[in-house]
């Protein structure tokens, strides 16, 4: 009886090891992280005299985490910024790439449903340690170029935090 119990335990243990080997560690964007992205984007917008802007932050699945609409921004900017962020997250690319592709004649892209695809400049993936954890989308600044610059500034806040955090961790390991 003891032998059967030992064998059963070994089988279960080996199954757990196999199951564990089939998973990967995935980074996730938190609400705190999304708020930092928005704060960085708003600070950049104010510093560069943007007339307004809506900043949306989504997770890697395109789900809204946080949104801020600066004073003076048109109401439709909220949905547009969410669409830009969602597009950047789901396609893992800046949305300017899609806008440029359409401008260059690939008009079939505009047939994609707008709930998943907003091919307008201003959506930027948020990358931490090589993993896309979400995206930021901006709409309502002075131009599409400024939308993108504000989004980049927001995304870079977390990238900078990750580098600082990694540096601090590495420094602690040194004897």
What are these regions (language model features)?
Residues 8-9, 19:
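Cleavable N-terminal signal peptides
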Residues 1-8:
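Bacterial N-terminal signal peptides that target proteins for export
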Residues 14-18:
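N-terminal signal peptide c-region/cleavage motif recognized by signal peptidases
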Residues 21-175:
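Flexible, solvent-exposed loop/hinge segments and secondary-structure transition points
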């Amino acid at each position: 009886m003891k032998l059967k119990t030992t064998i059963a335990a070994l089988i279960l243990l080996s199954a757990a090891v196999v199951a564990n080997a089939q998973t990967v560690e995935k980074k996730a964007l938190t609400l705190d992280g999304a708020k930092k992205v928005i704060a960085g984007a708003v600070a950049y917008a104010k510093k560069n005299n943007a007339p307004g802007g809506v900043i949306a932050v989504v997770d890697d699945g395109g789900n809204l985490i946080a949104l801020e609409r600066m004073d003076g921004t048109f109401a439709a900017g909220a949905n547009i910024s969410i669409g830009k962020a969602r597009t950047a997250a789901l396609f893992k690319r800046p949305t300017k790439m899609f806008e440029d592709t359409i401008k260059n004649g690939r008009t079939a892209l505009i047939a994609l449903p707008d709930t998943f695809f907003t091919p307008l400049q201003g959506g930027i993936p948020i990358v931490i340690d090589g993993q896309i954890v979400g995206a930021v989308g901006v709409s309502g600044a002075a131009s599409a170029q400024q939308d993108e610059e504000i989004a980049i500034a927001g995304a870079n806040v977390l990238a900078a935090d990750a580098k600082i955090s990694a540096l601090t961790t590495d420094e602690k390991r040194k004897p």
